[in-house]
């Protein structure tokens, strides 16, 4: 998806600017060139974070694609190559995402199969560029949705099992590379506009199984997501769900409390088998990119989404307060605050952008030209981006890259 490489370059520059400002405050002078390079190297090796930048799930589920798939994959490889050369080891170069695939309608099996197969596609792509598996595998992270289906209670352990086996046996990766790290966000799709207060109950259950399945990090959705961008009050309630589970709920103090339970072990084997079967279906269509050309993933997501909606509307999938156990008093009028930017906020942003353009009017054209030339010569685009963002805006860079990288066109 378009902005992440550029936003990441902004982020790295912000981290570096903070350290340079600190050096000047501590020493009362500008750093020498040698000192600047040492500060830059230390900053890049220390900074922590995650950038999503997953073009494959964009095509399959989220649809915010702006560059051609080939060019987007090249930029992802450029980011990881930059990370390897600059020892950026605490930052995740991609969050390989199943969340958006699930939110678009995929069931938990398809979510996991598509996400892991996308992950292996990135591995093959980076290996083809000459990177060593243990230099980049620890920089990969995953992002899953947790819904109401029982399969979600084992999605993490199945992902870790499949990933570890492939990393060890196929790619000869070390132990650190075999460890799959993943973030879970509770399912926004499972939250409903009817009797919204019930949504906190759904989110609590989803959060609980995510924690029991040893997720590395967790996002709990706000109850009013079905209607608006969450308010301050609803965000506090969502945060309280995590805090109560982690601070008050005693069983959560024990890792993996469901380990060894018959249903968990049985589900783990069944889900793994189903995911491996999906791998075969993808492989028979020429792998992930070959399957994308025929719309295989998108078609499957749409079929599963339609199946869910049918069951929701005919009542065969019970949703309390939506299609069963309806409130006898009817829907109460709910006053929900809709989140909107004020006119002052909009004008302030436009004014700051215009000021940035004016200040860098002399330097921007040469950096945009250098970016284009780097793409034409098949150089590392991200290495140039890190400097170009000091003078060029997101819109200027995107427009320039369209000219040489191509815009996204869906295969019909």
Residue ranges with predicted function:
Residues 1-146, 151-152, 170, 179-183, ...:
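Catalytic alpha/beta active-site cores
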Residues 33, 64-74, 187-195, 362-375:
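A short, flexible low-complexity segment enriched in Lys/Arg and Gly/Pro that occurs
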Residues 75, 97, 113-122, 129, ...:
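Active-site capping/gating regions of soluble enzymes
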Residues 240-243, 247-412:
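Flexible, glycine-rich loop/tail regions that form catalytic "lids" or insertion modules at the edges
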Residues 1, 104-107, 190-195, 226-228, ...:
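A short glycine/serine-rich beta->alpha loop
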Residues 43, 54, 68, 132, ...:
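Alpha-helix initiation/capping motif
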């Amino acid at each position: 998806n378009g902005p992440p490489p550029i936003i990441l370059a902004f982020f790295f520059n912000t981290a570096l600017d903070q350290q340079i400002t600190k050096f000047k405050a501590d020493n009362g002078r500008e750093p020498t060139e040698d000192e600047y390079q040492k500060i830059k190297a230390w900053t890049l090796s220390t900074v922590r974070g995650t950038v999503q930048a997953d073009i494959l799930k964009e095509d399959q589920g989220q649809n915010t694609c702006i560059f051609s798939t080939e060019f987007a994959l090249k930029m992802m490889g450029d980011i990881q190559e930059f990370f390897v050369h600059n020892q950026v080891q605490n930052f995740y170069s991609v969050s390989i995402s199943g969340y958006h695939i699930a939110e678009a309608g995929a069931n938990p099996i398809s979510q996991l199969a598509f996400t892991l197969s996308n992950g292996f596609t990135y591995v093959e792509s980076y290996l083809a560029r000459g990177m060593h598996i243990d230099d980049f595998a620890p920089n990969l992270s995953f992002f899953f949705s947790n819904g109401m289906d029982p399969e979600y209670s084992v999605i993490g352990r199945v992902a870790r099992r499949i990933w570890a086996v492939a990393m060890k046996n196929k790619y000869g990766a070390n132990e650190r590379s075999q460890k799959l790290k993943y973030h879970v966000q509770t399912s926004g799709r499972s939250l409903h506009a009817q009797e919204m207060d019930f949504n906190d109950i759904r989110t609590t259950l989803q959060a609980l199984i995510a924690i029991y399945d040893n997720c590395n990090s967790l996002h709990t959705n706000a109850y009013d997501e079905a209607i608006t961008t969450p308010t301050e009050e609803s965000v506090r309630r969502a945060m309280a769900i995590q805090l109560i589970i982690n601070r008050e709920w005693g069983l959560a103090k024990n890792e993996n409390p469901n380990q060894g339970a018959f249903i968990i072990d049985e589900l783990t084997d069944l889900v793994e088998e189903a995911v491996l079967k999906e791998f075969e279906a993808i492989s028979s269509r020429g792998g992930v990119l070959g399957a994308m050309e025929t719309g295989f993933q998108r078609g499957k997501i749409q079929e599963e989404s339609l199946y869910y909606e049918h069951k929701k509307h005919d009542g065969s999938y019970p949703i309390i307060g939506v299609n069963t156990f309806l409130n006898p008093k009817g829907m109460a009028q709910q006053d929900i605050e809709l989140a909107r930017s004020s006119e002052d906020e909009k004008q302030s942003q436009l004014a700051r952008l215009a000021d940035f353009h004016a200040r860098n009017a002399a330097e921007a054209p040469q950096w945009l030209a250098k970016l284009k030339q780097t793409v034409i010569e098949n150089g590392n685009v991200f290495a140039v981006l890190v400097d170009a963002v000091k003078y060029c805006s997101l819109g200027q860079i995107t427009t320039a890259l369209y000219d040489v990288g191509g815009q996204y066109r869906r295969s019909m």
